[in-house]
């Protein structure tokens, strides 16, 4: 009695798969395997063997005459491939006695672009084994064809190209086709060339442009960062200084640098006008002039830095020139009652501008409220603490002896009464 598995044993699945696979059918690759050969592998291991009629290891490249179809019809005729497809295709001559290939297709033509790229062997000899040419498909007829996204890479052997060049040089026609009438000439240029077809997409380029735009927006936002941290750092620096004396020492006695103008943010930072306690309260982030002015008005007593502003600076700075437009020249015949302009006066030289008058800090001596204790040059910025008496002190009215001496040191001229000018408007 024969055992059931003695003679009727089944072949392994791999053997059955080889038996079921027919010549010309698509190969069955295991999951994860892709057919992605290099240019050298395509020429050496596939095109050379195909031209020499040597059997290929697998039937993975179909034999199709590419110029009888449009490129969008070729994927369904390929044996293998998802995004790119490989074919063995013959090439015909464009003219019977020429060496130029015929690139015409069904509804368009293939146009060569760029220069031919030589394909070198990877051995020590580094010999040239083939040539690679890139072509683009155009709809319509030349030269008014419409460019498409279909690309072809054509691989040919160097021996074939050299023989074709020899034929073109000697102008010897190819052998006639046997059985043809009147000795018809064969238009076959190459028996086989290997072609790779794929469609170019712009998704990667669009995504890259989108990422570049996002990066540029982020860079712009980072470049225009809020300046609150910078202002907080400046306020903390005021708080860390040792009162007004520390500020004066830091500036080397030149109080003209106590007013800092930030041209990028259009804000003004006044350093040294507040006490250490006031500056410590502002260290949390005072970033605008209105907050600084409110804190100055809320001060209980005048700070020492305000009084020290009466001392002359080594390099006098014209505050009116920095904050006010240049004054117009007033004719000497103008007259108006003093109630319109009070007791204010200007330099006796009428043609001098207001920028030559200098600056004097105001200290009305009202220590109870401290609201009037502010430098005169802050008033053009809109600080409400400047009063009518401050205007008098600015323009050279009656001042204490110390203030008069400071005014003389700041190049003040003799008072001159102006009329028909309303300085309060």
From Swiss-Prot:
Name of the featured protein: NAC transcription factor ONAC010
Pfam families: NAM
Region listing for Disordered, in residue ranges: 1-34
Residues of the NAC domain: 29-200
Main localization, broad class: nucleus
Biased composition (Low complexity): 12-23
Biased composition (Polar residues): 1-10
A biological process from GO: system development
Recorded name of the encoding gene: ONAC010
Gene Ontology cellular component terms for the protein in this record: nucleus
Described purpose of this protein according to its UniProt entry: Transcription factor of the NAC family associated with male fertility.
Compartments reported by the entry: Nucleus
Known DNA-binding region: 129-206
A GO molecular-function annotation: DNA binding
Species in which this protein is naturally found: Oryza sativa subsp. indica
Keywords: DNA-binding, Nucleus, Transcription, Transcription regulation
């Amino acid at each position: 009695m024969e055992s059931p598995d003695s003679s009727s044993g089944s072949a392994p699945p791999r053997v059955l798969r080889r038996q079921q696979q027919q010549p010309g059918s698509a190969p069955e690759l295991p999951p994860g395997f892709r057919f992605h050969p290099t240019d050298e592998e395509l020429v050496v291991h596939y095109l050379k063997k195909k031209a020499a009629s040597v059997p290929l290891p697998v039937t993975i490249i179909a034999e199709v005459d590419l110029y009888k179809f449009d490129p969008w019809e070729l994927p369904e005729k390929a044996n293998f491939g998802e995004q790119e497809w490989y074919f063995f295709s013959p090439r015909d001559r464009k003219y019977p006695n020429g060496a130029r290939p015929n690139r015409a297709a069904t509804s368009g033509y293939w146009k060569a672009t760029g220069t031919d790229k030589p394909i070198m062997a990877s051995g020590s000899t580094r010999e040239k084994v083939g040539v690679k040419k890139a072509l683009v498909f155009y709809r319509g007829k030349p030269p008014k064809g419409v460019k498409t996204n279909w690309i072809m890479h054509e691989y040919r052997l160097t021996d074939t190209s050299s023989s074709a060049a020899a034929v073109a040089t000697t102008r010897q026609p190819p052998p006639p086709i046997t059985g043809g009438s009147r000795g018809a000439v064969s238009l076959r240029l190459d028996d086989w060339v290997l072609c790779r077809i794929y469609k170019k997409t712009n998704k990667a380029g669009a995504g890259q442009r989108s990422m570049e735009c996002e990066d540029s927006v982020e860079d712009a936002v980072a470049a225009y960062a809020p300046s609150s941290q910078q202002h907080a750092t400046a306020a903390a620096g005021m708080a860390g200084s040792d009162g007004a004396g520390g500020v004066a020492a830091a500036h080397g006695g030149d109080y003209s640098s106590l007013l800092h103008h930030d041209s990028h943010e259009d804000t003004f930072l006044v350093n040294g006008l507040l006490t250490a306690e006031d500056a410590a309260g502002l260290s949390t982030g005072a970033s605008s002039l209105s907050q600084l002015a409110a804190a100055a008005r809320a001060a209980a007593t005048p700070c020492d830095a305000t009084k020290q502003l009466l001392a002359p600076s080594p390099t006098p700075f014209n505050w009116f020139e920095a904050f006010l437009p240049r004054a117009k020249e007033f004719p000497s015949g103008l007259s108006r009652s003093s109630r319109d302009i009070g007791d204010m006066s200007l330099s006796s030289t009428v043609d001098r501008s207001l920028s030559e008058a200098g600056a004097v800090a105001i200290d009305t001596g009202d220590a109870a409220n401290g609201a009037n204790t502010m430098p005169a040059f802050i008033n053009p910025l809109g600080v409400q603490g400047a009063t009518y008496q401050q205007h008098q002190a600015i323009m050279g009215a009656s001042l204490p002896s110390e203030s008069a001496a400071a005014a003389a040191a700041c190049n003040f001229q003799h008072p001159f009464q102006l009329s028909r000018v309303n300085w309060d408007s």
